[in-house]
Curated annotation (Swiss-Prot):
<dbReference type="InterPro" id="IPR004522">
    <property type="entry name" value="Asn-tRNA-ligase"/>
</dbReference>
<comment type="similarity">
    <text>Belongs to the class-II aminoacyl-tRNA synthetase family.</text>
</comment>
<keyword id="KW-0436">Ligase</keyword>
<comment type="subunit">
    <text>Homodimer.</text>
</comment>
<keyword id="KW-0067">ATP-binding</keyword>
<dbReference type="GO" id="GO:0005737">
    <property type="term" value="C:cytoplasm"/>
</dbReference>
<dbReference type="GO" id="GO:0006421">
    <property type="term" value="P:asparaginyl-tRNA aminoacylation"/>
</dbReference>
<dbReference type="GO" id="GO:0140096">
    <property type="term" value="F:catalytic activity, acting on a protein"/>
</dbReference>
<keyword id="KW-0963">Cytoplasm</keyword>
<dbReference type="InterPro" id="IPR006195">
    <property type="entry name" value="aa-tRNA-synth_II"/>
</dbReference>
<dbReference type="Pfam" id="PF01336">
    <property type="entry name" value="tRNA_anti-codon"/>
</dbReference>
<dbReference type="InterPro" id="IPR045864">
    <property type="entry name" value="aa-tRNA-synth_II/BPL/LPL"/>
</dbReference>
<protein>
    <recommendedName>
        <fullName>Asparagine--tRNA ligase</fullName>
        <ecNumber>6.1.1.22</ecNumber>
    </recommendedName>
</protein>
<dbReference type="InterPro" id="IPR002312">
    <property type="entry name" value="Asp/Asn-tRNA-synth_IIb"/>
</dbReference>
<dbReference type="Pfam" id="PF00152">
    <property type="entry name" value="tRNA-synt_2"/>
</dbReference>
<dbReference type="GO" id="GO:0003676">
    <property type="term" value="F:nucleic acid binding"/>
</dbReference>
<dbReference type="GO" id="GO:0016740">
    <property type="term" value="F:transferase activity"/>
</dbReference>
Amino acid sequence: MENTLVKSLYRDTDKYAGQTVQVSGWIRNLRDSKAFGFIELNDGSFFKSVQIVFDTELDNFKEIAKLPLSSSVKVEGKVIATPGAKQPFEIKAEKIDIEGLSDSDYPLQKKRHTFEYLRTIAHLRPRTNAFSATFRVRSIAAFAIHQFFQERGFVHVHTPIITGSDTEGAGEMFRVTTQDLNNVPKDEDGQVDESKDFFGKETNLTVSGQLNAEAYALAFRDVYTFGPTFRAENSNTTRHAAEFWMVEPEIAFAELGDVMNLTEDMLKYAMKYVLEHAPEEMEFFNSFVDKTVLERMNNVINSDFGRITYTEAIKVLQESGADFKYPVEWGIDLQTEHERYLSEEIFKRPVFVTDYPKDIKAFYMRLNDDGKTVAATDLLVPGIGELIGGSQREERMDVLVDRIKELGMNEEDYWWYLELRKYGGTKHAGFGLGFERFLMYITGMANIRDVIPFPRTPGSSEF
């Protein structure tokens, strides 16, 4: 008999009612008495489990009644509609085959476990409700983002993981080497001889696919990357991970306003898609993780995003009378408390802050006519503050070279990036969305470690 997914049974119960079906999955819960028992069976296709009713008519009734949690079974039985019960249907088992026994020391027992404990068993945590919901939403959200760009004719570019340049100029990068660390070759000055390494020069894990994406935007017009990025930032916080995923579109013949419009459209599209395609999971998050999740998402979807310059924002904050931990003055990088005040108290909706001081932004951002600010934007949202950062890129070769020199960066590392301005360069712009930060926002999960299947953080590379 062909296997039927539990999702299909829930989505089209009337079609299956009265039919004999085969389902297979893992035992989430089992209750039994002398003559009958109930199994909560989850097959991974759907957030909810299906209730299996079994009784002494089964040849192996006693064996089934003693099965440990997480044992895998294959069940044949009749679908019976139960409109008055908690679940819309159940399956009356006619046959249950044991596929794989679980040991009795299975760590996920019936009690509720803390997220901290579940991180120590990351290989088993997707079997819990919270992480089943989280990682299905992660999958659905990723698909939504791809679909958004594909529907608009964007080309998906696979940018390199190993790179010879530092996009952000931050220097917090993971080095890549095949050198024998017990016998590293040195040059005449006693420095590591990079020419003897695999690539013949210093290489690192990428912090962003943006520079490579710019090259392809100047050929395909509209492109995006969606891939892993790495930061060797020794921050043990709930918001930082050493490995995370970035969504980075790049559009040619575009200015800052165009990229803000794209940001707003993408965010609303992805949120609507998740609400439509993961209703059970989103209801779970709203009930058990963060009771403001649905309200927050609907606020984003139904709002026209605000816009304010950095200079105006500083003035608003200074005149607000609010007691901030970090003093507000022109030139500071806005702190989370400032960002949240603007989005929650002033605008009460998402807001783009634009035209930041050049000294707190990256070298590739277009210098404004005032010589002090750059055409950059951060999208601030109620609940967390900054969600997305974007900018118009500097298309003028001479200005870009000056910025690279001003920041003490090695111009030679960026020769190819500069050449893009030499051969038919044009105005172009893009943004970066930390995918995990987006997931934290829409699920209410408070720690980045809980929205990545196997998180990589300082001192932690288990699994």
